[in-house]
Amino acid sequence: MRKQSKFFIFFLLLGVFPLQVNADTPAKVDAKAGATTKVDVVSTPTVSQVDKWKTLINLEDYVCNNKKREKINYTPNYYKYIDKNSNEIVINGRVYDYDASSGASRTVADMVNHSQTLKYDGKKGASKELEADPKVKEAMELAKKKTKKGQEKINAMYWSVQPPKGIIVGDYYSGKKVFDGGYEAYAEVVVNNNEIVHIELNERPPVTYYASEWAGETKRRSGYGFFQAKSPRTDYTLATLINGMSYLEWQVLKNQKLDFDYKTLFGSSNSARNGFVPLLKEMAKEVNEKATDKRYVGITQPYDCGISTRLEVIYEKGKIVDLKYDEIFADDKEDIKNPTLKEFYRQSKLESVEYNRITNKSFRTFVNTLRREVLRSQSLTEFPTDAIKLDMPHIKEAYEDYLFLAGKIKNIK
């Protein structure tokens, strides 16, 4: 009997212990539903757990020490992103030969790229009639002759993630279009005195994207271009989505309008045809009618260490309604002076998947906090800094660089 009593007490204690753990577990109130739900003990990390990533890397290694600002002109809209007078495709001072890099002439490619892209996306693909078309066969033969792999391929491919330097000011228009089952195309257009002075496109794949690393991440400066460059599909197109976006932007700035017959690059036409082009044409009416109360003020400052800092502010009727700060790494690895940061070339601190993985998204947290405080205070330079992690060297550096940019544009609206 005594033995049975001991067993009873033992099992009773087993039941009480988990009940006590649950009782000590903090409760989380769902403000929308008004219900109280339990939060798993493991899901609530301690401060030491949150900061554990800091012990895995030396944060001092992620700072550009002794960097110097490039001397630039701070007159608004002084720099031109493209050369409108050139017969060549000149974007941000670099000449692009998309006839050569696309693997086929644009004229022929425009006839076939949509079908070929569908095939490589694993969808139904082109009809047999189209595949048998002599011009299609000709285009594919040209493409095969230009096929490159390995380092030769990387050397042949070139895309830029650099924004225009200096200050840009004008009326602001933005749009978003969901296409192809969850992909999101974004467009921002700035117009000053009837001139389109700036346009920037970006794309975000759905959260169900087959490559989970890129699911829900923007593509322009995240490192997605390298993911595409490793794909067999680009062995002959030699073009990334970033090339395709830049080419569309060049056409808009060259034509000075949004509604016209766009040309697309071989290998990046799906996003253009189904996302960006329809979006830009939808925005054309709004731009033509000057139907906006928003103003854009942006500034990009290059540094000699291979990083450019960028601040973009959106005003609506004089009130700050949005802000974004970013730091963009150089297009060429050798231009980045800090060895630790070289691997992030053609990416930015805000968008880079790998940079944010290594630094625990600390830069994104900084930018989100910065945006929140600026919107609350309605000042680019006068706001509380308690929530900003200035004890981290790379964040302290970013904050100081931000203040320099903010000081340059705080009186411009």
Regions found by a protein language model. Give the residues of each.
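Non-catalytic cell-wall polysaccharide-engagement segments
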Residues: 2, 19, 355
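Bacterial N-terminal signal peptides
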Residues: 9-18
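Intrinsically disordered, low-complexity tandem-repeat regions
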Residues: 29-30, 34, 39
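Bacterial N-terminal signal peptides that target proteins for export
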Residues: 1-8
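Sec-dependent signal peptide cleavage junction
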Residues: 18-31
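Active-site- and interface-proximal helix/loop "cap" or "latch" segments in soluble metabolic
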Residues: 39-169, 175-413
